[in-house]
A protein has these predicted regions:
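Phosphate/nucleotide-binding beta-alpha loop and adjacent structural elements of enzyme active sites
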Residues: 1-161
């Protein structure tokens, strides 16, 4: 377990993580060393980038709407594709900010399915219903693809259509 890094700036407390390690590795948990580091947090919009960013994966345990709020200028200027996990508690706030410039696609990794979401799908998601027999409620990933991205490009990429 060398160089294992656990990020504590999330929804889990340090004690929660330590107890998980104790339970899962009772004979080895004393070998773990714990460090405390402080990091400066910056809004995405305040960071200078040397290269154009075209894809972003956001995984912040339900705080996606805050990340997206802090990157409004970046999204407007760069229009990257990005991926988030569906979270019912903040999805409407996210969609409200993005629907003007983005399409939303549902992707289920274990089935390799990719499906554009329409209003009826959003309603089903928000009501906790399975969209259809090919999609589970457990692992719903959402791709946001800029409306101005050429479909020709997407077709040629081999990933989406």
């Amino acid at each position: 377990y060398h160089n294992l890094f656990i990020h504590f700036n999330n929804s889990f407390s340090k004690n929660y993580i330590i107890n998980k390690i104790k339970n899962n590795y009772p004979n080895k948990y004393k070998q773990f060393k714990y460090k405390h580091n402080k990091y400066e947090l910056k809004k995405f919009d305040d960071i200078k980038y040397k290269k154009k960013i075209c894809f972003i994966k956001i995984d912040v345990e339900g705080y996606d709407h805050l990340v997206i709020e802090g990157m409004k200028k970046f999204l407007k200027k760069n229009k990257p594709i990005f991926l988030i996990e569906f979270n019912k508690s903040n999805f409407l706030r996210i969609w409200k900010n993005l629907k003007k410039n983005y399409y939303c696609y549902l992707f289920q990794f274990d089935k390799n399915n990719f499906k554009k979401l329409y209003n009826k799908h959003f309603n089903n998601l928000m009501n906790g219903k399975i969209l259809d027999k090919n999609y589970s409620k457990n692992s719903i990933n959402l791709f946001f693809i800029p409306k101005n991205l050429k479909k020709k490009y997407l077709k040629n990429s081999g990933y989406f259509f």
